[in-house]
Amino acid sequence: MIVAVSPQLDLAVSAFFFRDNRFYLGDWGFFPFLRRGLPEIFIGIAAAFGLIWGWGLLRRRWLWGINTKVMLLTTGSMLLGPILIVNGIFKTFWGRARPYQIIEFGGNKNFTSPMVISNQCDWDCSFMSGHTAVIFWSLALALLLPHRYRKWGISAVIILGIATGIARIAQGSHFVS
């Protein structure tokens, strides 16, 4: 909400990670893994839940409560949230350039407010982070874990989601908004 009122905060936060004409933390530590490997891991985790559901369907015995209703809900929320709304609509049609693409950070595109539909990006744009959306979607999966693991699963998803958001900002791929 603060960023919508003061879009300059987006530039200030991104500038914190921009030194010597580059986003200097882009290849630091586990940040490249977050960009390249993490989505595949979460797809694998979702596939594992699908296999658990399939096993339960064949055996007529549900493991961890993962039944057809649960699978429809989790799959539907993935299709609706991260895939359709975030990647299919916002990233495709919002047109907001990524930080590394804008003039302020050595690119040739104009900075635009997060609340303004723009023409500065044609495809795979900055607003919103698909990586972070997929990770936070996995909260639905964490809620399916047995009670003794659920708190740890939810905590892990929240920490990983925040870390991924920070990493994507540090890489110059997304603004804080």
Task: Label the predicted regions.
Residues 38-53, 131-145:
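Hydrophobic alpha-helical transmembrane segments
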Residues 12, 37-44, 70-73, 151-159:
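Alpha-helical transmembrane segments of integral membrane proteins
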Residues 5-6, 51-63, 142-149:
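Structural signal for the C-terminal ends of transmembrane alpha-helices
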Residues 26-37, 62-66, 122, 145-152:
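Juxtamembrane loop-transmembrane helix junctions in multi-pass integral membrane proteins
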Residues 2-4, 79-85, 159-169:
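Aromatic-anchored segments of alpha-helical transmembrane domains
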Residues 1-50, 88-99, 103-110:
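N-terminal transmembrane-helix/juxtamembrane module of multi-pass inner/ER membrane proteins
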Residues 55-93, 154-156:
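Interfacial segments of alpha-helical transmembrane regions
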Residues 112-177:
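Membrane-embedded catalytic cores of phosphoryl/pyrophosphoryl-handling enzymes
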